Amino acid sequence: MPRGDFVDPPPVNWDLVKDEALWKILSGAAERQIDCKNADRFEVSVDFLLQQVAWLTERHASQVRAQVRKATAAVRNSGPSPVPSGEPAGSGHQRAHSALSFRRDSPRNEAGSGTGTPLHSSMRPLVARNTSTNTTVLRDMTGAPASPRPGVGLASRAGDRRRLSSLPITSVPDKSLEQTAQPELSPEERSPSPGPAEDSSPTSSDDESIPAQSRIIRRPPRYQPPDGGQYEDDDDDESEPAFQPYTSPSSKTSAQDLGSTLRGDKPVSGKRPHKSHGKPAIHKSNTSDSSASSAAIIQKPDKTDRSTEQRTPGPLSPHRPAELTGRSPGGKDKGYSREGSEGTPSMGSSYSDLDDASVTQSALEEALASHMNSRGAGSRFSISQAFRSRYTSSSNQ
């Protein structure tokens, strides 16, 4: 590296003794002026001397700042309140003492301040806890003053209303007063108190609160329609369970309805018969299912038309079960599959399979499904049994 005409400065002879001597001169500068001739004895250049003076001054200032921080931290730890570094410690202690005395002397019965439990319910006796001793005291709202706890300060504001609700339950006029005062209670008063002091007297509080709770929780009766009311079809579908046969009070008409359902008779009118007894008919159908249905199967309707009697299911012919099994899902290998007829034909299917019975099979199923939906009577018999009876009756004709 070319240095040109630069010449190295002479080596400096400096040690700790010269540092202490220089610091003594700097520390006494407040009392008297510094003599410039004293710098000659250090035998250093002026630039180095000024640099050393600045370093010593900065070191002293950093030490002073560290001592101030330590003193401030010690005062904060010892005193109850933080004391600023510029103020004396005595005034800080005096202000902290006044704040503590103000907190001790000020009453804390506001509604917002309070770590106490919420207000007790009006249907239970007020349980007050003495702060000095850990015992619980039961106080009646009519005769005793308010609880000393800070959270129950609002009990005195609603005194009349609370007293009416806490009167004895046995007397008749008191019950009327309680019933008039109960709708005015707020939701907080209705909810039972979660405080731990209620567990001390479970028997007395529960015995007194049971009738009151039964009155408060009692719901208004639901709307009950008249006995002879007419229901729409939608209401019948919602009120009746699914797949439950309709049973009228008379056994004769129920026998005719169920018999016509098995034989596939068309309904007399487009609308389903209305209920005559409302909801009791549902309970009757639940209890008398087996008896009514068995009676319906045994009895024969008193009709002059003999064509309906010929439709009653008789014994199956020996050829018909083979055809039925051929059309069942288990007999798909014989070529009677419906999926093959709808889509691509199966291996054994031909035009000879499409006889009258197989052509009318889908029409019979659709008619039976629509008939059962309109009548709402598909409980005891499955669709396969009903279809089998319909199919055999039509084939016997």
Swiss-Prot record:
Identification of the protein by name: Autophagy-related protein 29
Quaternary context: Forms a stable complex with ATG17 and ATG31. Interacts directly with ATG31. The ATG17-ATG29-ATG31 complex interacts with the ATG1-ATG13 complex. Note=The interaction with the ATG1-ATG13 complex is induced by starvation.
Function recorded in the entry: Plays a role in autophagy. Functions at the preautophagosomal structure (PAS) in order to form normal autophagosomes under starvation conditions. Also plays a role in mitophagy. Autophagy is required for proper vegetative growth, asexual/sexual reproduction, and full virulence. Autophagy is particularly involved in the biosynthesis of deoxynivalenol (DON), an important virulence determinant.
GO CC entries: phagophore assembly site
Deletion consequences: Significantly decreases the radial growth of colonies under nutrient-rich conditions.
Domain of life assignment: Eukaryota
Composition-biased stretches (Basic and acidic residues): 300-309, 330-341
UniProt KW Protein transport keyword: yes
Family: Belongs to the ATG29 family.
Biased composition (Polar residues): 245-259, 343-363, 381-397
A Pfam family this chain is assigned to: ATG29_N
Keyword terms: Autophagy, Protein transport, Transport
Localization per Swiss-Prot or TrEMBL: Preautophagosomal structure
Lineage: Eukaryota, Fungi, Dikarya, Ascomycota, Pezizomycotina
Keyword Transport tagged: yes
PANTHER family on file: AUTOPHAGY-RELATED PROTEIN 29
GO terms classed as biological process: autophagosome assembly; protein transport
Biased composition (Basic residues): 269-282
InterPro entries: ATG29, Atg29_N, ATG29_sf
Compositional bias (Acidic residues): 230-240
Main location: other
Region (Disordered): 71-397
